[in-house]
Amino acid sequence: MAKVESFTLDHTKVKAPYVRLITVEEGPKGDKISNYDLRLVQPNENAIPTGGLHTIEHLLASLLRDRLDGVIDCSPFGCRTGFHLIVWGEHSTTEVAKALKSSLEEIRDTITWEDVPGTTIKTCGNYRDHSLFTAKEWCRDILEKGISDDPFERNVI
């Protein structure tokens, strides 16, 4: 079975919330794709409920694209503690952390239900499982802790 980097990470050593560069892969023509760990809550101590996580996912899909070039995808971890962010090229963890912080601030402060994309039966595969209230509450809690650009040392941006 292939070795997956995420499953070799010592989850007891990280200090969430943080942004971590997992890997930079280079394609046959030299194109680079970077994978980031956007860890919002401490592993094995908490998990974001699916309704809130789902709403944060839909909002980050747009908000991160507004703030970073080359966003390919932002997908939640099955453990519900954060997201994978996949981008063309490379960004520093500080740059990604600033974009994430700004996005979470917008969710917390200004987003209304009408702003949440993909919440109908035609536009979402599980449209009933959303909660903007839960998303806002978790964004508030995450931002109160501060987002670090280092997974092992608290270097809050």
UniProtKB/Swiss-Prot annotation:
Its EC number is 4.4.1.21. InterPro entries: LuxS_sf, Metalloenz_LuxS/M16, S-ribosylhomocysteinase. Disulfide bonds: none annotated. Binds 1 Fe cation per subunit. Fe cation binds at H54, H58, C124. Pfam families: LuxS (PF02664). Its cofactor is Fe cation. One of its GO terms (molecular function) is S-ribosylhomocysteine lyase activity. It catalyses: S-(5-deoxy-D-ribos-5-yl)-L-homocysteine = (S)-4,5-dihydroxypentane-2,3-dione + L-homocysteine. Gene3D superfamilies: S-ribosylhomocysteinase (LuxS). Keywords: Autoinducer synthesis, Iron, Lyase, Metal-binding, Quorum sensing. It comes from the Bacteria. GO terms for biological process: quorum sensing. Homodimer. Belongs to the LuxS family. Involved in the synthesis of autoinducer 2 (AI-2) which is secreted by bacteria and is used to communicate both the cell density and the metabolic potential of the environment. The regulation of gene expression in response to changes in cell density is called quorum sensing. Catalyzes the transformation of S-ribosylhomocysteine (RHC) to homocysteine (HC) and 4,5-dihydroxy-2,3-pentadione (DPD). This is S-ribosylhomocysteine lyase. It comes from Lactobacillus acidophilus (strain ATCC 700396 / NCK56 / N2 / NCFM). The gene is luxS.
